[in-house]
């Protein structure tokens, strides 16, 4: 569950699609605090699961259908995206 409050503006590093799935890489800092692999981060309102964490960003798997049907479809390298961590259980 998310609060709907944007915590940080991130930047798209890359979107790599291979067939019907792909990887979205986002440059971020604040939303990484306390985040672990498997946690959820909303990217422009789309709930994605973190698959890797770097000191200045993260990656998440994304389906081609999600990109087609959401605001992620208009994202390019360098695009700003709204980021929000999921609420604690």
Predicted regions and their residues:
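Conserved loop->alpha-helix
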Residues: 1-89
